[in-house]
Amino acid sequence: KGTKGTFALTGATIETVTRGTIQNGTVIISDGKITAVGANVAVPQGATVIDCKGKFIYPGMIDGGSILGLSEVGSDPRTQDYNEVGDVVPQMKALTAVNPNAVAIPVTRISGVTTTLVVPQGGLFPGTASLINLHGYTPDQMYAGFDAVVMNFPTTGRRGFWDRRSDDDIKKAVEKSLGKINEVWEKTIQYHKLDSANKGKVTYY
């Protein structure tokens, strides 16, 4: 876990998002937040100074999709919590299954990744993905304020020379998959109409 206080990272080459590259720059961090960045930044009294000469500082990287915090040991199903039962379960939120104490989280953070989108796996609509910061004691503390329903678009095309299905069989598989998606959309529209007519008081089943 992080350490509180005021820190000054000095003498570094700083790669910024909007201000280009700063040579021999300083970054001030106070109570977990960056408060100053520049080449002529005064070091606050009492700050812990860390000499970063010859090193690079850059914004934390964002992983656009992973099961970090949802999976621990691949051979132990008790540590796997990224695949819920059911093919259409958009109400299942990945955030509720995130383990803040997962060993891979600090390892990933120290490698420069500070944020990741945790994505549920599985069926057509396997759940809702959540953006998390890789620092916090609870899932709510880690939550970065973004959710999105995940849809795994069906893949029914020929997968290689070993796929011996006829063209007609592949066409039928495509139509079946698209029909399933259309069924979900139709049910969603009907639910929305009922929910709107009842002013948001319809119970979800």
Name these PLM-found stretches.
Residues 14, 18-58:
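Histidine-rich, glycine-flanked metal-binding segment
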Residues 6-7, 48, 60, 114-117, ...:
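Structural motif
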Residues 104, 109-205:
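Polyanionic/metal-chelating signatures
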Residues 17, 92-95, 167-171:
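Second-shell loop/turn segments in exported
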Residues 1-7, 43-44:
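N-terminal helix-cap/turn-to-beta initiation motif at the start of protein domains
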Residues 55-111, 116-119:
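Metal-associated gating/positioning segment near the N- to mid-region
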